[in-house]
Every structure is written in structure tokens, then in C-alpha cells.
Regions:
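Alpha-helical membrane-anchoring segments
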Residues: 1-458
């Protein structure tokens, strides 16, 4: 075991080109900048982040302060400026840290705007604070000179990218997806597309797209790492992401982030190899390529090495545990929502719901209803009405809104009917439980009812 550790440490300390990290940094910064500009240009900062009077929060994240609206707008400007600095490699660690803090703060304000690519940007932003992303093609490298990077840095970013595809692929191995759902509900809406539109409404199209998507996610990382299949695999990847964006524009910048970020799975010096093949720079053979690594890297202090290794292992373990944590909960996590977010469950769910809250005054047992539509924005209400934890939070807010003149805590129960992937609507929550008295629990919520139908057979 000690010998294996030593060999792994030696391989991770080996100097490699920092060009693939530079491409990833430039792409990440560009997409981060474009995302911030898009949020501001479309008015989403006001409507989704600064505008709502009440926010629905991620579990255990209620301690994150909700700043005034003007501060939220300022944070998005900071995100844009920090992303631009990351893109050009200007004090990249400070810029990445600023981006990560501002972006994560904004992301944690509102659970109903959760997107997988926001979570991916949070993780990559944190990684870029510590990885040597500006060793090449950056303002920093112009000031201090270009340098190579440890191979471990490249592999850590590779893991970051690979985990998205691998866990997204594993998540697709369920009965609904392999039977063409929810794609079978979405694709007919694109029947207006030329040439292929008439085919999209068929069950065969939904099955082919579902099985093809699962196969792609489960295998593309291996094919990108293998030189013999790399070019074909990347062409397939580009085609897959562009096609997905054309069919479902709501996925936003995710394809434009993953297409360039996936190139980190190529050889670390792939940009130079491409330029050499195009005749845009003289060939430099690997055995004669001069080393530009900072002096003394080979004599890294043992204590520092152990700290770095432990931190990397914990970081990787966290990102393996989060997508798999739903296994610790009973029932179907797509229905209960427990362990769903931060797990790369990409395009797996079509939920529609309706919820009405029954409020009871314990003093005289008088009861009335409130659908909470005046408390939350349409976007918040739509997501909340299908999510048990957010319904619980809404019940607490409904109690506050209706209990201003009451001397006793009001009881709030929910009639929540939800449809999952085309199933008949069914009760999501026990209608007899007073949600206003229910705290958040780390474990399973006992008042969430099981999915009424058995999962569709594989």
C-alpha cells in the first residue's frame, strides 16, 4: 500500500503542460461572464433573486443572509468582473475566490432556481482557487513567466468534469428513463422543427433519445480519455450538447460550458499539438520540450504533501457521496426530493403539482385555505408545489402571514397533488400533518407519502 501511495504521489507530481487548464479557465470565465450579463440583461436578477419578498431556501442553508436588492445586483456585477479576470488570468486565484464567494452566495439565496450547471460552476470555481489555472495564456503568466503544472492538478479537474457525465449516466438507469420518460412528454412539443419534427412525437424517438443519452453519459469520458476514439467522441459530444440545446433551450449555458471544459480530458498539451498540426507553431517533441516548472517542486515538503492529499481525497469523496446520498433515503428520490439536488439528475423529471394550505386556528378550530400564490412569485410557486421540503417551508410562511392577529400558533396542513413523469396526480404529503409544527430533519421526512405507482420496469 505504501508503495502504491508513493507511485501515485510521484505520478501526480510529474510536470505536464498547463495548456489544457488554460483552455478550461478561459472557457469557464467566458461562460461565467456571459451568464452574469444574461441575468442582468433579461431582468432575472430582479425577478428571480432580488424581487421575491420571501425566499425558499436550501435545507440547512437558512443561515445564509439575504441581502437587500441593490446588494444582489452588485453581487452579480462582481460575478461578471471576477469571471472576466478569471478568463484572462489576472490574479486568477483572488478572482476565482471572489467569483466563488459571490456566485455561491447568490445561488444559495433561492432554491427554486437550482440548475445543475450552477452547481457545476460552484464546484469548478472552488477548484480554480487552488489549482494552477493561470500557468499558461494568462496575464499572470506574462508577468511571472509560463510554467508547467503537476499532473494531479489536471486529473482533479478531469474528475470534476467526468463526475458530471458519469453520475448523470447512472441516474438515467431507471425504469422511467429507459421507457422514454420524461422525453416522451417533451419531444412532441418540438414537432414544429423542420425535417425531424414529425418524428419527435413518436415513442420510438423518445426511446432512442433516452437510451442514446444514457449510453452517451456512461461512456463518453472513457472515449475522450482514449486517444484512438477521442476525436470521434468529441464530435459526438459537441453534436449531443448542441442538439440538446436546440431541442430544450431552457437548459441555458450548460452545453456551452461542457463542450470546452470536456477538452481537459485530452492530453494536457493538446492545444500545442493542434497548432503544430495546423502549422501555426514549430513542433516541439515531448522528449526535448524544455521544462518550465518552478524550481524545487520535486522536493515538496512532506507535511504539505499530506495536507494536499487529504484535502483532495475529501473533496473527491464529497462529490461521490452527494450524488449517491439518495440511497440513504427510503422511496423514490425523484418523488420525495430527498437527495435529488446536487446529484446530477439531469433532465430526469417532469413534475406538475397543485397545493392548497388548510389553516386552522387552534382556539376555535376554525379553518380556511390559502394557496400561497400571493406570497411567492409564479416561478417560486411552480417549483414549491412539487417539492415536499419547500412545501414545508411555505407552510411556515403561510402560518406567519395568516397569524398576525392570532394569539396562538396556527396549524397548517397541505393538500398537495403531484404528477411525476406523466403519472396520475397523487398526494405528495400526509394531509393530516401540521407542517407549521414540523422542523427540517436531516433524515427522511415521515410526512412525505410514497410514490403511488411502482417504478416503471426496466
Amino acid at each position: 500500500m505504501a508503495d502504491l501511495y508513493t507511485r501515485a504521489l510521484s505520478a501526480g507530481s510529474r510536470d505536464v503542460s498547463g495548456e489544457s487548464l488554460a483552455v478550461a479557465r478561459i472557457a469557464f470565465g467566458a461562460v461565467g461572464l456571459a451568464s452574469a450579463i444574461r441575468l442582468m440583461a433579461r431582468g432575472w436578477v430582479s425577478s428571480l433573486l432580488a424581487g421575491p419578498e420571501h425566499h425558499l431556501r436550501y435545507p440547512a442553508m437558512g443561515w445564509v443572509p439575504v441581502p437587500p436588492g441593490w446588494v444582489v445586483h452588485l453581487l452579480v456585477v462582481v460575478i461578471a468582473l471576477a469571471a472576466a479576470c478569471v478568463m484572462v488570468g489576472f490574479h486568477h486565484r483572488a478572482a476565482a475566490a471572489t467569483f466563488w464567494i459571490a456566485f455561491t452566495w447568490v445561488e444559495l439565496l433561492e432554491a427554486t432556481i437550482y440548475l445543475n450547471h450552477y452547481w457545476f460552476m460552484t464546484l469548478v470555481g472552488a477548484s480554480m482557487v487552488v489549482l494552477p489555472m493561470s500557468a499558461r495564456w494568462s496575464v499572470d503568466s506574462v508577468r511571472r513567466g509560463p510554467s508547467d503544472v503537476p499532473a494531479a492538478a489536471v486529473w482533479l479537474l478531469r474528475f470534476q468534469v467526468a463526475s458530471v457525465y458519469l453520475f448523470a449516466g447512472l441516474a438515467k438507469l431507471n425504469g422511467d428513463w429507459l421507457n422514454g420518460l420524461p422525453l416522451g412528454l417533451w419531444l412532441p412539443a418540438r414537432s414544429d422543427l423542420p425535417i425531424i419534427g414529425s418524428l419527435l412525437g413518436t415513442h420510438t424517438a423518445a426511446l432512442l433519445a433516452s437510451w442514446g443519452g444514457a449510453l452517451f453519459d456512461c461512456t463518453v469520458v472513457g472515449f475522450l480519455l482514449w486517444r484512438r476514439t477521442r476525436i470521434v467522441a468529441w464530435i459526438v459530444l459537441v453534436t449531443f450538447h448542441v442538439s440538446t440545446w436546440l431541442l430544450f433551450p431552457v437548459i441555458g449555458v450548460f452545453p456551452w460550458l461542457m463542450i470546452p471544459m470536456s477538452t481537459v480530458l485530452f492530453d494536457p498539451d493538446w492545444p500545442s499539438r493542434v497548432l503544430e498540426r495546423l502549422g501555426l507553431r514549430p513542433a516541439v517533441h515531448p522528449q526535448t520540450r524544455p521544462s518550465t516548472a518552478p524550481a524545487g517542486r520535486s522536493a515538496v515538503r512532506p507535511l504539505r504533501t499530506r495536507v494536499v492529499v487529504v484535502a483532495a481525497v475529501l473533496w473527491i469523496a464529497l462529490q461521490i457521496a452527494l450524488p449517491l446520498r439518495h440511497l440513504a433515503y427510503p422511496g423514490d428520490h425523484r418523488w420525495t426530493g430527498e437527495g435529488l439536488r446536487f446529484g446530477w439528475n439531469v433532465m430526469l423529471i417532469e413534475k406538475a403539482g397543485d397545493v392548497t394550505f388548510r389553516i386552522t386556528d387552534p382556539r376555535d378550530r376554525s379553518t380556511w385555505t390559502d394557496d400561497a400564490r400571493t406570497i411567492y412569485t409564479p416561478q417560486q410557486w411552480r417549483v414549491m408545489s412539487t417539492d415536499p421540503e419547500l412545501i414545508r417551508q411555505a407552510a411556515h410562511q403561510v402560518a406567519l402571514e395568516n397569524g398576525a392577529t392570532s394569539t396562538a400558533p396556527l396549524e397548517v396542513r397541505a393538500d398537495a397533488l403531484v404528477s411525476l413523469n406523466g403519472r396520475t396526480s397523487a398526494r405528495l404529503i400526509d394531509p393530516d400533518v401540521d407542517l407549521a409544527a414540523e422542523p427540517w430533519r436531516l433524515g427522511a421526512q415521515p410526512w412525505v407519502l410514497p410514490v403511488p405507482e411502482a417504478p416503471r420496469p426496466l
